[in-house]
């Protein structure tokens, strides 16, 4: 059961002490993400756990572009391997609006191939909470054979996820 395991977001915390609080607290407003990085990590975790309702509810309505809960449920559903957050920031504009960005690589395996979503995601703070708006995709380069594995196992890539 995931509740007593390390959270998929990469925080090294137990899921119930990490993203589960955000996943369960969203509807009640009891616990909301406090910054873009926390929201992005909780969204990655929601993808891993197939909590697509959370994905839709944390995606700003003006940027959904027709994305629906049903589409997310239909897939495809890759095997998520690991998350690397490369940078994160949030800023307040001169007009008082708040926004932020998070650059990350979300590694996955699908049809026997390893790849990553390498993205600079944009976030906006509205209605007292953070929302994902859009992402700008970049090309991800696979690690070298002797580099640390993308799943953060501590093994070399060639001895872990690269093996199959």
From Swiss-Prot:
InterPro entries: NTF2-like_dom_sf, SEC_C_motif, UPF0225, YchJ-like_M. It comes from the Bacteria. Belongs to the UPF0225 family. This is UPF0225 protein Shewmr7_1921.
């Amino acid at each position: 059961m995931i509740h007593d395991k390390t959270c998929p977001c990469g925080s090294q915390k137990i899921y119930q002490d990490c993203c589960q609080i955000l996943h369960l607290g969203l509807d009640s407003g009891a616990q909301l993400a406090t910054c873009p990085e926390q929201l992005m990590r909780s969204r990655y975790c929601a993808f891993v756990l197939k909590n697509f309702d959370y994905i839709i509810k944390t995606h700003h309505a003006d940027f959904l572009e027709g994305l629906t809960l049903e589409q997310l449920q239909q897939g495809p559903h890759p095997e998520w391997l690991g998350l690397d957050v490369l940078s994160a920031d949030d800023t307040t504009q001169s007009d008082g609006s708040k926004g932020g960005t998070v650059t990350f690589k979300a590694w996955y395996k699908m049809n026997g191939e390893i790849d990553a979503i390498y993205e600079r995601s944009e976030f906006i703070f509205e209605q007292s909470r953070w929302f994902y708006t859009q992402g700008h995709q970049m090309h991800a380069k696979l690690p070298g054979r002797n580099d640390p594995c993308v799943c953060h196992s501590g093994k070399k890539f060639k001895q872990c996820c690269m093996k199959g």
